[in-house]
């Protein structure tokens, strides 16, 4: 059974697809999510303002901004609107000040953890192929930042994923 639509969104990093084309496609995908009553997994890279503007056009569509790279201010705006923030191994990197700040400061019930496989492997595996077996490193880092245990983070993020994707416990 389909649980979400994604990965959809905007990526202005390489500029290989015109921004207007990306925005049009994103709006069409958000409209489909609304029609099907499904959450979305949003990829947004270097397109923070446009990404927020478009999700605001669809207030009844919710989801996760995966592999989050935006500011704490934007994360707070997304959380206010009912969105989740996805963290990858980036949060373990020494130079990941923004990701750390967001992970420390948004509500635990809005955090998801992920691989973004095959990219974004956490320290000490940075630069290698990522896979699901490395997600505990992400949980451990967020736990350390928040003064919790990795088990606390695992339990909370599992519940968050079940809630977002409407998965019954035990399935």
Language-model features, listed with the residues they occupy:
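Amphipathic alpha-helical segments at domain termini/boundaries
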Residues: 120-122
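Mid-to-C-terminal alpha-helical segments outside catalytic/metal-binding sites
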Residues: 32, 133-171
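Rossmann-fold dehydrogenase core element
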Residues: 110
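Conserved beta/loop motifs at nucleotide-recognition and modification sites
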Residues: 116
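His/Asp/Glu-enriched short active-site or ligand-binding loop at hydrolase and phosphoryl-transfer sites
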Residues: 82-96
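Active-site phosphate/pyrophosphate- and oxyanion-stabilizing loops and adjacent acidic/basic residues
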Residues: 100-101, 140
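Divalent metal-binding pocket/active-site signature
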Residues: 1-81, 93, 101-102, 106, ...
């Amino acid at each position: 059974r389909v649980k979400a639509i994604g990965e959809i969104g905007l990526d202005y990093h390489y500029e290989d697809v015109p921004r207007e084309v990306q925005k049009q496609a994103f709006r069409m995908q958000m409209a489909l999510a609304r029609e099907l009553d499904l959450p979305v997994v949003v990829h947004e890279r270097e397109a923070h303002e446009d990404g927020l503007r478009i999700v605001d056009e669809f207030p009844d569509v919710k989801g996760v901004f995966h592999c989050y790279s935006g500011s704490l201010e934007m994360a707070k705006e997304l959380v206010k609107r009912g969105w989740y923030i996805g963290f990858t191994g980036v949060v373990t990197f020494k130079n990941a000040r923004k990701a750390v700040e967001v992970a420390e400061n948004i509500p635990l019930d809005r955090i998801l953890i992920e691989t973004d496989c095959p990219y974004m492997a956490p320290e000490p595996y940075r630069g290698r192929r990522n896979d699901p077996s490395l997600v505990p490193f992400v949980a451990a880092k967020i736990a350390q930042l928040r003064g919790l245990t990795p088990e606390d983070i695992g339990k909370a993020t599992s519940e968050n994923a079940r809630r977002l994707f409407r998965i019954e416990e035990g399935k």
